[in-house]
């Protein structure tokens, strides 16, 4: 991610779905007024979901996702369809594209019903209408209106109704829920200390995304941000004329930082703030006590929303399993997932421990949490789990009164 661009997780995600050769890629090019997607008469040109970050007026920053055809064939086709289905879990808006010259198929109607079942804001787009005479257009419109009034006859070739479609997409933009990282916890000129370890896993020349976002949120709310490594924390606190309003640490440094920061100073972590921002913190706190019941052989899934090169002291694959073994005095079986890969079937797991989800948009993070809940599998968070195992969970959520009540 460039430091000058909106993070992917903060963009409105628009998924483009439909059968092969429905005109999904040509529609994307028409909507964006750019040749972003490869267009071909050959079926199956798009073999994997393709993500395109851009500005789309009047929406603003968006992530457009071009998906493989949902009627793909063969073993590889089934895998491509599964990838397209995964995209449904992260979309804020879905466009179902139908080749108007072919008409609505039963598969199209089934997918539309699936979109409605997910309560996903959707538009039915009847593309290639330049191939139909007025009578056939009228008949197709009547059939489509039986499914939804939110349908458009468009032509990606002539740009017919493309502007109207863009306006309709903008009107479907999800109403933003006012969630804060920490802006509601501080006042102007409050001091916030950010503890950001620089170790072998840290990216070269920049802070990781949660640290960037929290730092920006402090500045946006007129706070005073002091950023240090764990090794300089004690000296930084000693030099401050006033105690900080809040200390935010990387979760993996929770144990050491909690010993340095006076008990009178509120302390939390980037991961906890990120889970709060994504709306999954309450369920993560309620789930963490499952660690008390872990036994030998229990399966624990540790899941990250991004993919990165694993280091020898990687938090997900090395440190967390080590802390869990030490805390539980047991030998559970650890499984791992990263990026877009998150199991559909979670029933085999005693517990899911998920990262803060900075690289996932709110809808996908909520989808993962809801999937776990539907299968009665507790899902907690890196920061919550680490704080709990270090005996400082109450302290780490004390700055968040609504969450702190869950531990009373």
Residue ranges of predicted features:
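Conserved C-terminal guanine-recognition region of P-loop GTPase G domains, centered on the G4
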Residues: 52-60, 79-151, 181-184, 207-223, ...
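Helical mechanochemical/support elements of P-loop NTPase systems and associated helical scaffolds
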Residues: 42, 46, 50, 80-90, ...
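C-terminal effector/interaction modules appended to NTPase cores
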Residues: 1-2, 11, 19-25, 204-408
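G-domain G4 guanine-recognition motif of GTPases
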Residues: 67, 98-101, 120-136, 152-160, ...
């Amino acid at each position: 991610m460039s430091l000058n661009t909106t993070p992917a997780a903060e963009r409105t995600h628009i998924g483009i779905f439909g059968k092969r050769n429905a005109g999904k890629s040509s529609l994307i090019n028409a909507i964006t007024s750019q040749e972003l997607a490869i267009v071909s008469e050959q079926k199956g040109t798009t073999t994997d979901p393709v993500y395109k970050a851009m500005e789309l007026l009047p929406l603003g920053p968006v992530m457009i996702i071009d998906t493989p055809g949902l009627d793909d064939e063969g073993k590889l086709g089934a895998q491509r369809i599964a990838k397209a289905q995964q995209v449904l879990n992260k979309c804020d808006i879905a466009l179902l594209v139908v080749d108007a010259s072919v008409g609505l198929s039963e598969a199209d109607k089934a997918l539309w019903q699936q979109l409605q079942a997910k309560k996903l804001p959707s538009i039915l787009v009847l593309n290639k209408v330049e191939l139909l005479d007025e009578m056939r257009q009228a008949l197709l419109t009547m059939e489509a209106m039986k499914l939804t009034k939110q349908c458009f006859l468009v032509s990606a070739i002539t740009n017919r109704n493309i502007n109207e479609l863009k306006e309709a997409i903008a009107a479907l933009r999800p109403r933003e829920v006012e969630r804060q990282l920490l802006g509601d916890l501080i006042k102007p000129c409050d001091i916030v200390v950010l503890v950001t370890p620089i170790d072998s896993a840290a990216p070269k020349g920049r802070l990781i995304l949660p640290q960037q976002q929290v730092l920006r949120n402090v500045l946006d709310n007129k706070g005073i941000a002091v950023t240090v490594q764990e090794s300089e924390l004690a000296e930084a606190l000693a030099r401050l004329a006033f105690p900080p309003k809040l200390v935010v640490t990387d979760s993996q440094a929770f144990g050491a930082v909690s010993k340095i920061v006076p008990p009178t100073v509120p302390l939390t972590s980037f991961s906890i703030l990120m889970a709060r921002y994504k709306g999954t913190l309450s369920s993560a706190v309620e789930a963490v006590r499952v660690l008390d019941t872990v036994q030998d052989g229990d399966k624990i899934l540790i899941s990250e929303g991004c993919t990165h090169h694993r280091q020898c002291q990687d938090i997900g694959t090395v440190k967390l399993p080590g802390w869990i073994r030490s805390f539980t005095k047991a030998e559970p079986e650890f499984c791992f997932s990263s990026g877009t890969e998150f199991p559909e079937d979670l029933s085999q797991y005693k517990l899911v421990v998920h990262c803060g989800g900075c690289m996932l948009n709110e809808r996908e993070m909520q989808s993962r949490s809801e999937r776990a809940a539907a299968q009665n599998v507790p899902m907690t968070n890196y920061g919550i789990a680490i704080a709990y195992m270090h005996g400082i969970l109450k302290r780490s959520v004390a700055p968040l009164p609504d969450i702190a009540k869950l531990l009373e």
